[in-house]
Regions:
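Transmembrane signal-anchor helices characteristic of membrane glycosylation enzymes that use polyprenol
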Residues: 40-67, 153, 241-252
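Membrane-interface transmembrane helices that cradle and orient dolichyl/undecaprenyl
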Residues: 177-192, 220-224
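Juxtamembrane membrane-water interface segments immediately following transmembrane helices
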Residues: 67-69, 74, 234-334, 341, ...
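Extracytoplasmic catalytic/substrate-binding loops of multi-pass membrane glycan-assembly enzymes
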Residues: 62-76, 88-101, 109-110, 261-262
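Transmembrane-helix signature of polytopic, membrane-embedded enzymes
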Residues: 130-153, 171-172, 186-193, 467
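Transmembrane alpha-helices of multi-pass, membrane-embedded glycan-processing enzymes
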Residues: 98, 102-109, 115-129, 170-173, ...
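Multi-pass, polyprenyl lipid-linked donor-dependent membrane glycosyltransferases
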Residues: 70, 93, 115-122, 149-181, ...
Length: 545
């Protein structure tokens, strides 16, 4: 006969645990409960993330291995001297930090589709980071979720993530700098260093990132306490911001032989903006410069981009000859002289031209105006898009065909489209799948209002956050509009203006509440936790151990 107590003893010994330890089943239960609680608390973000993920999967399977834009070639081949595509000179037009930071490392895996996947993950990561920042700083969960919805659902953002272009990397660096600097109410020196490096690294990706030093420096100085800390943080921010820029310029001079610069297109776009704005009939300039000043009808048709890049622009068709030397005259110095003449004699025309471009982002619909870079370049197409009329772009056939580009850069197969997914994405984009301009305007106005809630002797965390985010939006959007307006350059609005609006609206609401009650109503910034995130982290770490 078997003793029942002896029969159950082995089972009991198997379930025994060391004193002070937690059973594995209990740890797993804690993880499950933490995940369940997290989902319940952040259900709106979860729904938006699910929708954003579906849209990104459609884009990934709809256009393989990735989309190519007119300027994609210079990033793919800008540092490959002597390629069969003969585009090595294009790397000097714009900084190619995107090639160095993303394309070259990822193409080790010999498939451009991995670049698109990485950029889609970047879009999702920006959403989660911004949402976590807002919840941490005490904003309501529903407001934080609505503020990040444009990043997840905007079809132009989806198109950018699927395209071999630097826009998404620029957004990621911009968001990284904002999140690092705002994570605590007053950033420690380590976060100032990291935030400055993130902002500075954005400039070799898109040169307009140079403007981020202004809001970044203002914020770290204003957020610090004591003049010594302000001086230290300001100096460190400036140094760390400059480090990636100087490093890239050195690389450009020593390795690429383009010169100690980020780009060589500054003078060209200065000419384009001023020539487009000029009243040539009343402008007092030398006769040799006169042909470079376009007629009003020509300027309106070409726009700023066409004035710089079109083969029909005055800078392309005008070829003055030095009779004595018997050679053509380089017109670039003449273009610069014309630009400065316009700035001196007609500054308000230039200001007005920039102002008209800067408000286009607030339009209800996505309609291009005469002279604007065609918005038709950025909607999803039902077949693979080609740009055969541009020297540096891809064509359907020939040596610059998209399929040959993919083969030359490491693989991914031929350019192909899954039409059902492409049709769905195009219909979504053309029927309201984008962020309307009034949303941006509301975010901007709320962000500005939040700045004016700053109070010296009370909690000013949200007001200072509004300074950084709204200032960053001003820097990158207006900085781009100084040279030209294109809808592609408005993408950073998605990761700044709605967020600025959420911070600003919360700051205003708390300010009004405090004025009515006579007591500060602010939640101590940085003490609000992410509603279950910490509990989940603890549970996961215990499960792993």
């Amino acid at each position: 006969m078997i003793d029942r107590s002896e029969a159950v003893a082995p089972a009991a010994s198997q379930d025994a645990v060391a004193p002070g330890s937690v059973p594995a089943s209990s740890r797993l239960d804690r993880v499950i409960w933490a995940l369940t609680g997290l989902t319940r608390r952040h259900w709106l973000l979860g729904l938006l993330l699910a929708a954003g993920l579906v849209l990104r999967l459609l884009a990934q399977v709809g256009y393989e291995p990735a989309l190519l834009y007119i300027d994609s070639m210079k990033y793919l081949f800008g540092t490959h001297l002597g390629t069969q595509f003969n585009q090595s000179d294009l790397g000097s037009y714009d900084p190619i930090g995107y090639s160095l930071l993303v394309l070259h490392p990822v193409l080790i895996f010999e498939n451009l589709s991995f670049v698109a996947v990485l950029q889609h993950l970047g879009g999702l990561a920006m959403t989660v980071a911004l949402y976590a920042l807002m919840v941490r700083r005490g904003l309501t969960r529903w407001l934080a979720a609505l503020a990040v919805a444009p990043v997840l659902l905007d079809s132009y953002q989806l198109n950018a993530e699927q395209t071999i272009m630097p826009d998404v990397l620029f957004e990621v660096l911009l968001v990284a700098g904002i999140v690092l600097l705002l994570w605590p109410p007053r950033p420690a020196l380590a976060l100032v260093i990291l935030g400055g490096l993130a902002f500075g690294a954005s400039a070799p990706v898109r040169q307009v990132g140079e403007a981020l030093i202004v809001p970044g420096l203002i914020y770290v100085v204003a957020a610090a306490r004591g003049w010594r800390t302000r001086l230290l943080h300001g100096a460190v921010m400036t140094f760390c911001f400059a480090l990636p820029i100087v490093g890239y310029m050195t690389y450009s001079a020593v390795t690429l032989h383009y010169g100690f610069e980020l780009s060589n297109m500054g003078d060209a776009y200065l000419y384009g903006r001023t020539a487009h704005a000029a009243d040539c009939a009343t402008l007092k300039i030398p006769a040799i410069e006169r042909p470079l000043c376009p007629d009003p009808a020509v300027a309106a048709t070409l726009g700023v981009d066409g004035t710089v890049n079109s083969i029909d622009s005055p800078r392309s068709t005008y070829h003055p000859v030095d009779v004595q030397a018997g050679q053509l005259i380089n017109t670039m110095p003449l273009q610069v002289q014309l630009a400065y003449s316009v700035l001196r004699q007609q500054p308000m025309r230039v200001v007005g031209d920039i102002a008209r471009d800067s408000v286009k982002i607030f339009a209800l619909t996505r309609n291009g105006e005469e002279g604007d870079t065609p918005i038709s370049r950025w909607p999803f197409q039902t077949s693979y898009p080609y740009y055969p009329y541009y020297r540096s772009a891809t064509a359907h056939y020939g040596r610059n065909s998209a399929s040959r580009v993919f083969a030359a850069t490491g693989g991914g197969g031929k350019a192909r489209v899954f039409r059902p997914a492409a049709i769905l994405l195009r219909d979504y984009q053309l029927h309201g799948g984008y962020t309307p301009g009034p949303v941006y305007l509301a975010g901007l106005l709320a962000g500005i209002a939040g700045i004016f809630t700053w109070r010296r002797r009370r909690d000013s965390g949200l007001a200072l956050a509004s300074v950084l985010i709204t200032g960053s939006a001003f820097a990158v959007l207006l900085g781009a509009d100084l040279y030209e307006f294109t809808w592609r350059y408005q993408l950073p609005a998605l990761v700044t203006l709605p967020i600025a609006g959420a911070f600003g609206a919360t700051a205003v609401a708390r300010y009004i509440r405090a004025r009515r009650s006579g007591v500060p109503a602010a939640v101590p910034a940085g003490h609000a936790h992410a509603d279950g995130v910490e509990e989940l982290a603890v549970a996961v770490s215990e499960q792993a151990s």
